[in-house]
Amino acid sequence: MNIVKTLDAKGLACPMPIVRTKKAIGTIQSGEVLEVLATDKGALNDFSAWAKSGGHTILEQTEESGVLKFYIQKA
C-alpha cells in the first residue's frame, strides 16, 4: 500500500474527522492512499458512508490502542 499522506484526526469529534478528510483527499491524486487516524467511534460508520458516496475505497481499517486507522484510496 502506497500511503502518500497521513491525516491525524485524533481527539476530534464528529463531523470534524470527515471534514478534514474531505479536505485532505482533495490534495492527493486518484488512486493514491490517504491514512486517517481517528479516535471518535462514530468514524466507523461515518467513513464507510462517506467513502461509498464519494466513490472512494477503504482498503483497510484497523484499531490499535483506541486509535482507528483508515486507509482510503481516492477514486
Predicted features, each with a name:
Residues T6, G31-E35, V67-K69:
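Intrinsic-disorder/low-complexity, polar/charged segments enriched in Ser/Thr/Lys/Arg/Asp/Glu/Gln
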Residues M1-I28:
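An N-terminal amphipathic alpha-helical segment
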Residues S48-A75:
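C-terminal structural segments of small proteins and small subunits
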Residues M1-V4, D40, Q73:
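Generic cytosolic/nucleocytoplasmic N-terminal low-complexity/intrinsically disordered segments
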Residues R20, A24-G54:
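Amphipathic, hydrophobic secondary-structure cores in small proteins
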